[in-house]
Amino acid sequence: MTITIAMAGKGGTGKTSLASLIIRYLLRHNAVPILAVDADANANLAWSLGLTVKQTIGSVLADFNDVKMGIPPGMTKEAYLNLKLNGAVVESKNVDLLTMGRGEGAGCYCFPNNVLKEFIDKLAVNYRFLVMDNEAGLEHLSRRTTENVDELIIVSNHSVKGVRTIGNILDLIKELKLNVKRQSIVINQAPGPLDPMIVAGLEELGVGADAVIPMDSLIADYDLQQKPLTELPDTSPAVRAVDGLMEKLLATRRADRERG
């Protein structure tokens, strides 16, 4: 059964970097194959994984809706669209990537998200893990594109605003009655130990930080050198923190299975 791990959080909190380091962990532990999904219109996950995207869900849909495109004789519209969508999957040895891209028009992402969700449901059964990097904010939750997940990673930077966003996300999960089996709180880009104001803010929400990922100059260095984050060394502080998070998540899943 495919295990789905999805990111949520405000912009600028490092969700893409975190998704990349989660994939790095899975690759290092041979937890493959992996389907990576970039559901952010401002797509960057491919770069972090060292992959090249030629087509996105958005571009496939735009082409498909072009009146000039003809459907081959004997093929239904649905079958042809599915064929074109499969062409948007970037394949590599152990991790494949699907990128949503932009919608049909400015600010229009609803149809691509609906198609993405249905397509992912069919595609995901072929993978051990699905790791989804979502767009900033709460839109993907309100549109229910992150509806059924095993592990929802709620990411905040070391800021009071970020903690408030955590509260908004937790409220929305309850309001929409989303099928989120477990949620983890991650404070990313921490300059040191958590500030008492951050700790107090989390306590007010009735949660704590499941992981604190320190600021890591290596991530900025790799960005400048245009190197995939999956190639970061084991000595990277961020890698160590994410590895610890994943060990905790997978240990909890094993314990849950043993309890039946």
Regions found by a protein language model. Give the residues of each.
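C-terminal boundary of histidine-terminating zinc-finger modules
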Residues: 225-236
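Active-site signature of alpha/beta-hydrolase-fold catalytic machinery across serine-
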Residues: 21, 25, 48, 144
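C-terminal alpha-helix
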Residues: 241-252, 256
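N-terminal phosphate/diphosphate-binding loop that engages ATP/GTP or pyrophosphate donors
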Residues: 28-91
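Conserved catalytic-core segment of NTP-binding enzymes
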Residues: 111-215, 221
